[in-house]
């Protein structure tokens, strides 16, 4: 026996589900959705049925909802950076504004349908910004609002923007923001902290936020600032998707003048001298917060990019590196942040492949760096064809925590000491190699952690933007901050929709 949607609501009430039926009927009518417009649905597969939900979303959003067999569906699923996230959701809804996001979450909550949310899709963890056939994908790529306050001090950024577009928009005004280091990365990286080339001077991306616009699970659209919903404001700076869907935010700007940059390659046999230079740089050079460096250690060679906030050739902050034999890669020069991001982005392959990142942290220590590098060398020698593991130590200054505290605080629990965020960036072609490559990446950092613990230099903090799916990022913030995340989640999402229906992610209920 089959029923209309109205009939199903009546059937649900007979099963002591009257509140659900009543709320659902009211919800659909409030969105001007007439249940009689839909096909007949089996009452056994009503709530939680992604097919039914997609029919409702198509009726509600029209061309802003894309089904499996529609033109553009495949292209939308393959926006994500890593092929490991190229999966097929039941449908994709692409809201045009916060009001659309509100309608979408109201429908998903009413129909108890699983969902995932995607901004730029650079997160390589399957399910974090992708969804399978049992779920709906909310793509925020159309939320591309960009504006600048009259005094040029605040930039309003829609969460669908990528950082390259943001920098390009702001450059004619001679201002910029503390955003992502790669132009193709989506702006939602702010919710994980967001490491910028000049975070030593200005803090993490999250620390420069002045306002968040957030859609909550009941569909309400709220603002979070240092003085309004201040607990939500702080929790969003590192708390990711536990509270609602961020649709736009305001970032403080800074003057965008010419920057110094230089990139050099170091032969592999120079790694002991390079580690010594890295430690010395953190001990003294990083006290100059205008200085920053980016590292990339690969089988082909070890790349270090030197950056300085002022147009100064070979600043003294980098003195420890100048005596190590090297080969020029980018000669010394000056560039705007827009030009710099574009130039450095050339080094990142645009060819689709399988990607994963994993991270750990420890106090800066030459012996740990040398030990971990040695383990990495052993492991990369065993990799299958068309697979690579990049070893990326990121020096973090002791003052980074204070930068966050200065502007309302964040939820990260950063160590107030010089330390290293060590990333392993995995890239490979063959799905059959998934387990081998992922296990190899984990092995390197497990061994590194064990050695760091033996030296009493291990730090529990995990940088969300570079973490892998199985890492307990929220727990790494410390018990006090984790408990704050739980409290804020329960306050702003009392139905716990984002815990129960949202796909994979760094959610407190899964740690």
Swiss-Prot record:
Domain of life from the UniProt record: Eukaryota
Keywords: FAD, Flavoprotein, Oxidoreductase, Signal
Induction conditions: Expression is down-regulated by the cluster-specific transcription factor AOL_s00215g275. Expression is also down-regulated by the HOG1-MAPK pathway downstream transcription factor MSN2.
GO biological process, one term: terpenoid biosynthetic process
GO-annotated molecular function: FAD binding; oxidoreductase activity
EC number: 1.-.-.-
PTM annotation (Pros-8alpha-FAD histidine): residues: 122
Pathway(s) of this molecule: Secondary metabolite biosynthesis; terpenoid biosynthesis
Segment forming the signal sequence: 1-17
InterPro entries: FAD-bd_PCMH, FAD-bd_PCMH-like_sf, FAD-bd_PCMH_sub2, FAD-linked_Oxidoreductase, Oxid_FAD_bind_N
Disruption phenotype: Abolishes the production of arthrobotrisins A to D, and leads to the accumulation of a pair of epimers without the characteristic epoxy core. Shows substantial reduction in conidiation. Shows significantly increased ammonia levels in fungal mycelia.
Keyword Signal set for record: yes
FAD-binding PCMH-type domain sequence ranges: 85-256
EC main group: oxidoreductase
One Pfam family hit: FAD_binding_4
Family: Belongs to the oxygen-dependent FAD-linked oxidoreductase family.
Function: FAD-dependent monooxygenase; part of the gene cluster that mediates the biosynthesis of sesquiterpenyl epoxy-cyclohexenoids (SECs) such as anthrobotrisins and arthrosporols, metabolites that possess a novel hybrid carbon skeleton consisting of a polyketide-derived epoxycyclohexenol combined with a terpenoid-derived monocyclic sesquiterpenol substructure (PKS-PTS hybrid). The SEC pathway plays an important role for fungal soil colonization via decreasing fungal nematode-capturing ability.
Alphabetical list of PANTHER family matching this protein: BINDING OXIDOREDUCTASE, PUTATIVE (AFU_ORTHOLOGUE AFUA_1G17690)-RELATED, FAD-BINDING PCMH-TYPE DOMAIN-CONTAINING PROTEIN
Protein name (record): FAD-dependent monooxygenase AOL_s00215g279
Organism: Arthrobotrys oligospora (strain ATCC 24927 / CBS 115.81 / DSM 1491) (Nematode-trapping fungus)
């Amino acid at each position: 026996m089959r029923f209309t949607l109205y009939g199903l609501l009546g059937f649900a009430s007979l099963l002591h589900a009257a509140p659900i039926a009543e709320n659902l009927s009211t919800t659909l009518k409030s969105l001007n959705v007439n249940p009689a417009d839909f096909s007949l649905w089996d009452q056994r597969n009503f709530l939680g049925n992604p097919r039914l939900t997609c029919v409702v979303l198509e009726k509600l959003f029209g061309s802003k909802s894309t089904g499996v067999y529609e033109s553009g569906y495949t292209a939308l699923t393959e926006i994500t950076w890593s092929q490991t996230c190229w999966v097929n959701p039941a449908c994709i809804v692409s809201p045009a504004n916060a009001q659309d996001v509100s309608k979408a979450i109201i429908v998903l909550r009413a129909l108890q349908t699983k969902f995932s949310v995607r901004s730029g899709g650079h997160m390589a963890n399957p399910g974090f910004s992708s969804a399978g056939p049992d779920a709906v994908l909310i793509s925020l790529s159309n939320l591309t609002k960009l504006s600048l306050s009259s005094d040029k001090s605040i930039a309003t950024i829609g969460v669908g923007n990528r950082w390259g577009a943001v920098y390009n928009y702001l450059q004619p005004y001679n201002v910029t923001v503390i955003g992502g280091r790669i132009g193709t990365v989506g702006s939602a990286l702010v919710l994980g902290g967001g490491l910028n080339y000049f975070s030593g001077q200005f803090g993490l991306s999250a620390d420069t936020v002045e306002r968040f616009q957030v859609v909550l699970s009941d569909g309400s659209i709220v603002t979070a600032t240092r003085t309004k919903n201040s607990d939500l404001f702080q929790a969003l700076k590192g708390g990711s998707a536990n509270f609602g869907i961020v649709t736009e935010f305001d970032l403080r700007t800074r003057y965008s003048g010419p920057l110094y940059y230089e990139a050099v390659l170091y032969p592999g046999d120079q790694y002991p001298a390079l580690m010594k230079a890295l430690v010395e740089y953190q001990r003294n050079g990083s006290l100059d917060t205008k200085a920053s460096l980016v590292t990339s250690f690969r089988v082909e060679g070890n790349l270090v990019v030197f950056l300085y906030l002022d147009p100064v050739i070979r600043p003294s902050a980098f003195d420890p590196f100048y005596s190590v034999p090297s080969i020029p890669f980018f000669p010394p020069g000056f560039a705007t942040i827009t030009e710099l991001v574009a130039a450095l982005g050339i080094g990142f392959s645009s060819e689709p492949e399988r990607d994963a990142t994993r991270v750990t942290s420890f106090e800066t220590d030459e012996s740990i760096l040398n030990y971990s590098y040695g383990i990495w060398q052993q492991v990369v020698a065993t990799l299958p064809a068309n697979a690579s593991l990049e070893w990326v130590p990121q020096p973090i200054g002791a003052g980074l925590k204070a930068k966050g505290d200065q502007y309302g605080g964040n939820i990260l629990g950063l160590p107030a000491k010089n330390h290293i965020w060590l990333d392993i960036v995995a890239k490979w072609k063959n799905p059959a190699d998934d387990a081998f490559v992922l296990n190899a990446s984990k092995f390197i950092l497990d061994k590194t952690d064990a050695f760091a613990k033996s030296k009493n230099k291990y730090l529990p903090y995990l940088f969300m933007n570079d973490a892998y799916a199985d890492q307990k990022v929220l727990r790494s913030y410390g018990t006090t901050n984790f408990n704050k995340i739980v409290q804020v989640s329960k306050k702003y999402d009392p139905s716990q929709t984002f815990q129960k229906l949202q796909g994979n992610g760094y959610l407190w209920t899964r740690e």
